[in-house]
Amino acid sequence: MAKEWGYADHNGPDHWHELYPIAKGDNQSPIELHTKDIKHDPSLKPWSASYDPGSAKTILNNGKTCRVVFDDTYDRSMLRGGPLTAPYRLRQFHLHWGSSDDHGSEHSVDGVKYAAELHLVHWNSKYNSFGSALKQPDGVAVIGIFLKIGHEKGEFQLLLDALDKIKTKGKEAPFTNFDPSCLFPACRDYWTYHGSFTTPPCEECIVWLLLKEPVTVSHEQMAKLRGLYSSVENEPPVHLVRNWRPPQPIKGRIVKASFK
């Protein structure tokens, strides 16, 4: 059996290209953002998300992250505007985090790493299926939100309370009536660039919208996330931490800012 990718030394990001060659491609994510090199693009429009809370379906521990899955069979929960030329359907969101509060985000800003990074994954519905969208350079749009330590975020607690039902790898539970826009920061300013999924197969099909303003969560809330296990039930427990990919070479790509 082919070895499964992961985040350990033997199957971690340095090895992903052995099974998924595109992981060494020219448009890989995440990247380090250096704000002095980023230009404001006045043509970038504001973005808007209109999410139907009824489209939230389940929450899942896949051993790599916790993921909330949405019904994307029709245009229910949509992302529009910004750098996008078409509406995109919300498919899922998930998080990346570290073993302590001082790191865990995948993107960094002027050397600053945050405690976690939330990714909301949308696909361009003109391509008819998520699988088809993965083959297009503008097939997927991901909103990235940084989580920093500070005051507790009440809206985030709804998600954390569901984690007790999915402690171990392979567990899934109903998670309904949730509008993830409650997790957005007040400020909608963003950076945008063309990149990839940060997990294998690392397809280069993503228009990234990285929000400038982080949201705050408490130390206790982050600890709850780290209480998940990457091991299955009745196996020796292994904590699910350090599920982030290090920065990839920017290779001449341009990052643009929606703000001055």
Spans of model-derived segments:
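Alpha-carbonic anhydrase
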Residues: M1-K260
